[in-house]
UniProtKB/Swiss-Prot annotation:
Pfam families: IGPS. SUPFAM superfamilies: Ribulose-phoshate binding barrel (SSF51366). GO terms for biological process: L-tryptophan biosynthetic process. Keywords: Amino-acid biosynthesis, Aromatic amino acid biosynthesis, Decarboxylase, Lyase, Tryptophan biosynthesis. PANTHER family: INDOLE-3-GLYCEROL-PHOSPHATE SYNTHASE, TRYPTOPHAN BIOSYNTHESIS PROTEIN. This is Indole-3-glycerol phosphate synthase. The gene is trpC. Its EC number is 4.1.1.48. It catalyses: 1-(2-carboxyphenylamino)-1-deoxy-D-ribulose 5-phosphate + H(+) = (1S,2R)-1-C-(indol-3-yl)glycerol 3-phosphate + CO2 + H2O.
């Protein structure tokens, strides 16, 4: 685990302890189990594939540890509406406060503003956060292989599925992919950003892609910034993309999405 990831995970455990002290697990579980309005995250991606289109998981992100504030005028509902109007398949919403200036209400607001399924983008290490995710309306959660032992990943995946959520498992190398492929999820995300150096290489996806088979969906994450990047991935058989920063830096995020993915089609 990288130094920054170690730091973030330590923070998460502190946050969970504080959350448990103010709101017990049973209460959050009850909220999660009472939450209706489930949207099928995987089906939304496959629907785009069936039309021969890129399936874009469009990110709602204010800031990051490496870049600082990315979008000053940050209005999650308006951003989500823009994405939905311009062909996004799903949303990804940052809920981590300390490092990404995210918030649970951003996911709630973004999802309420459109018809798209939403991923809770956070560093999930405990069942409490899985219940939180469903309670706030998430349709999918992120599990980062670098941050979790396999038995824990399996347990968190099982709970997410029980609550009606999909799981996107994120990997960066062969060892992490070995673990990810032992989960049931169809969604395998390849993070092109090295969490130790923050360097980005699209070759990471291309290297791991041949092993993401058996009906699984490979999701390329980080570093997709140009039409050439998109064409490279599509020519290699990748048709699902998680993109945030390239859209967040533009005045109209949805129009930026359309230019990047659909202008050439």
């Amino acid at each position: 685990m990288s130094d920054i990831l170690n730091t973030i995970i330590a923070t998460k455990h502190q946050e969970i302890a504080a959350a448990l002290a103010s709101r017990p697990l049973a209460a959050v579980r009850a909220d999660a189990e009472a939450r209706g309005d489930r949207r099928d995250f995987v089906a939304a991606l496959r629907a785009k594939h069936a039309l021969g289109k890129a399936a874009v998981i469009a990110e709602v992100k204010k800031a990051s540890p490496s870049k600082g504030v990315i979008r000053e005028d940050f209005q999650p509902a308006a951003i989500a509406e823009s994405y939905a109007a311009h062909g996004a398949a799903c949303l990804s919403v940052l809920t981590d406060r300390q490092y990404f200036q995210g918030d649970a209400r951003y996911l709630e607001d973004a999802r309420a503003a459109c018809h798209l399924p939403a991923l809770r983008k956070d560093f999930i290490v405990d069942e409490y956060q899985v219940y939180e995710a469903r309670a706030m309306g998430a349709d999918c959660i992120l599990l980062i292989a670098a941050a979790l032992e396999l038995p824990k990943m399996k347990a968190l995946e099982a709970l997410a599925n029980e609550l009606g959520m999909a799981v996107l498992v994120e990997v960066h190398n062969e060892e992490e992919l070995d673990a990810a492929l032992q989960l049931k999820t169809e969604l395998v995300g390849v993070n092109n950003r090295n969490l130790r150096t923050f360097e980005v290489s699209l070759a990471t996806t291309l290297k791991l892609l041949p092993r993401i088979t058996d009906g699984r969906i490979a999701v390329t994450e980080s570093g997709i910034a140009t039409v050439e990047d998109v064409r490279l991935m599509q020519a290699s058989g990748v048709h699902t993309f998680l993109v945030g920063e390239a859209f967040m830096r533009e005045a109209e995020p949805g129009e930026a999405l359309s230019r990047l993915f659909f202008a050439q089609s």
